[in-house]
């Protein structure tokens, strides 16, 4: 996909010129000039869009097309309005099978041109994204391949930043959408190594089962033991500032989750290929950071395995010893994500991080609580919470803070081990899962993102969303600016 900027939009810049106008129908100077050349055509078309979101087409204007969209009152044109208008424009361009367009929308009053450009590109890229498919016969596809923006105040630097973000999001989506017979733990490791070969600032180590065992990662090994696919611990570094403490992102990389012996229902089990979306987001963020050349140190740690059923699979009631030395009674084999994360979070201690954020499709309970709008997050660190909230607001990648009170820890008591891996009832499931993880994070500042509701869209049109890559990139940009 090609994105660009122009200071002099015209009908001939691309196949279609898109013009956003406010309800007063006042035209910017360039549009007035075009209107004069076309004997008042634009003003006539504007009369046909009386309500916000209304559109009108005019084809065959000097061999090109013109789309007018009404943006409402100037004083009411907000970030939400922008998102709606960009969505309507993108869907219209795709429906009309345009391969290129020049988009001229009004500036937001309260936001920078850089921010507005990023939001428009992220929105367009999200809607034009096409699933990787394995069909032997393909219908003729027609993709929107080029969008040029006229946005006073936007710079080439801001354009390159926006392109880096959507590249990271696309990489995340491509990985998450890959079928589980291809995207195995080994494949994830290969993708991480590939990043280290693409960028000089990235290095990578992929650790196999023998060394995982030597390090005492009994929880990760327990989850993996039911599958013929060996587990992988991926340790990938972006070296942007050798003098600063690293930020660590820990990703859950369960490339397929049957639930183990606590087997999931058949309905929608195919979507459990998305259980590695946390890992995919970590790799997407690292790729974007390399493109952005952020002056930070960033480490991605991914614990990857398959959770399957076999004669060697872990059983309900088994007790395992984690890398931290703490023991866990496995009450529910379908609460496997927190097990692999426990060892990965302990592994993170060796790097003396500034802070750690884990990203995981961890619980169905978070979907019940928040649906697919906001990512649930938990932390005891108020400064980190403020940073996450700020990044979420700026990136429009929504979050909602859930409690992490000490009283919830009681649900994890075991008569046989230091803890159980899941509560005996379903109450407060997302919170007790985070409480479990908190027991492995006492040596650093930590936050947990439960992306089970936001990482993918379910159903017939199932598709990875690429969230929370925009949120995390914005957070890391703040870290970079503070150093």
Curated annotation (Swiss-Prot):
Pfam families: Peptidase_M17, Peptidase_M17_N. Its cofactor is Mn(2+). GO terms for cellular component: cytoplasm. It is an enzyme of class 3 (hydrolase). One of its GO terms (biological process) is proteolysis. The keyword Cytoplasm applies. GO terms for molecular function: manganese ion binding; metalloaminopeptidase activity. It comes from the Bacteria. The gene is pepA. The active site is at 264, 338. Its main location: cytoplasm. Its EC number is 3.4.11.1, 3.4.11.10. InterPro entries: Leucine_aapep/pepB (IPR011356), Macro_dom-like (IPR043472), Peptidase_M17_C (IPR000819), Peptidase_M17_leu_NH2_pept (IPR023042), Peptidase_M17_N (IPR008283). Binds 2 manganese ions per subunit. Mn(2+) 2 binds at residues 252, 257, 275, 336. It comes from Legionella pneumophila (strain Paris). Keywords: Aminopeptidase, Cytoplasm, Hydrolase, Manganese, Metal-binding, Protease. This is Probable cytosol aminopeptidase. Presumably involved in the processing and regular turnover of intracellular proteins. Catalyzes the removal of unsubstituted N-terminal amino acids from various peptides. Mn(2+) 1 binds at residues 257, 334, 336. The keyword Cytoplasm applies. Belongs to the peptidase M17 family. SUPFAM superfamilies: Macro domain-like, Zn-dependent exopeptidases. It catalyses: Release of an N-terminal amino acid, Xaa-|-Yaa-, in which Xaa is preferably Leu, but may be other amino acids including Pro although not Arg or Lys, and Yaa may be Pro. Amino acid amides and methyl esters are also readily hydrolyzed, but rates on arylamides are exceedingly low; Release of an N-terminal amino acid, preferentially leucine, but not glutamic or aspartic acids. It is found in: Cytoplasm.
